[in-house]
């Protein structure tokens, strides 16, 4: 088990510090089997050009899995049932966790170090709908997805900026969503990715459908492949991010109802 950094006295005094001490929620056996089973057939992957298929009813050919696609980009999908979680809680979490380091660390105490909101005034603007307090903001993140702590910039976008049909967000098709283009601290260096977290409300909670397209970026308002033709994203990077996603969202599903109940007004 990775060693957790000790909390400072100031952090230990925070009302949500107790969540840092919880054991990580085990990844379900069926998901571990997918991880161990190796990559899916790339033909099952959702092409980034077809991303609005997420709004279609039912499931897509791959809801849980990872691969390197034929064009060299990486793809991963995860489906997480989050019992007792509402779309409002999910939107709140993305705004709330970016304001203090420990809030991000309780999400995955072994692999998360900080997520720092660069647009605090917008995130704290109570006149905005909760999801819009994250849309259009930037998080500076330090996390470990398998290769040691790695700095990352996450630019959260309004869905229409990422080519999604934003008019369907907040409907039966999609209760809410978070999407971002991520890259290293120096744009153009390292591996970039397009991230989407798509939420459906179901009986007893929500279903979170996550998609990552690794090797893509947002350039001049268009989602483009940044990996040169003939070059592929290393499979171990895709597999590592898939494993991390299974872990972090499984744990968030376990803690979010209580974190929200106790801290929803604690900005």
What are these regions (language model features)?
Residues 154-158, 194-199:
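Broad, structure-driven detector of short, well-ordered beta-strand segments within folded domains
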Residues 112-187:
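Glycine-rich portal/gate segments that line the openings of hydrophobic small-molecule binding cavities
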Residues 101, 115, 143, 220-221:
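Amphipathic alpha-helical interaction segments
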Residues 14, 26, 33-128:
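Hydrophobic ligand-binding cavity/cleft-lining segments
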Residues 1-70, 184-188, 198-267:
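Terminal "cap-and-tail" regions of soluble proteins that handle hydrophobic small molecules
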């Amino acid at each position: 088990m990775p060693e957790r950094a000790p909390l400072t006295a100031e952090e230990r005094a925070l009302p949500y510090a107790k969540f840092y001490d919880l054991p990580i929620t085990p990844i379900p056996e069926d998901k571990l089997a997918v991880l161990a089973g190796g990559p899916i057939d790339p033909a099952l992957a959702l092409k980034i050009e077809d991303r609005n298929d997420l709004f279609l009813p039912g499931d897509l050919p791959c809801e849980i899995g990872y691969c390197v696609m034929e064009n060299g980009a990486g793809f991963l999908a995860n489906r997480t049932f989050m019992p007792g979680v509402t779309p409002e809680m999910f939107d709140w979490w993305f705004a709330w966790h970016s304001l203090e380091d420990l809030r991000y660390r309780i999400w995955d105490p072994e692999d998360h170090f900080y997520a720092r909101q660069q647009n605090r005034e917008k995130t704290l603007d109570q006149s905005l709908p909760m999801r819009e307090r994250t849309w259009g903001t930037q998080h500076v993140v330090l996390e470990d997805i398998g290769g040691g702590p790695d700095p990352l910039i996450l630019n959260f976008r309004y869905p229409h900026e990422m080519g999604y049909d934003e008019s369907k967000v907040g409907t039966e098709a999609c209760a809410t969503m978070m999407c971002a283009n991520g890259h290293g601290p120096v744009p153009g260096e390292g591996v970039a990715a397009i991230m989407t977290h798509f939420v459906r409300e179901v009986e007893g909670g929500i279903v979170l459908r996550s998609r990552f397209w690794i090797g893509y970026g947002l350039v001049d308002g268009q989602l483009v492949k940044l990996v040169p033709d003939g070059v592929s994203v290393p499979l171990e990077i895709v597999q590592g991010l898939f494993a991390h996603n299974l872990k972090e969202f499984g744990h968030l599903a376990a803690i979010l109802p209580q974190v929200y109940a106790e801290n929803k007004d604690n900005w």
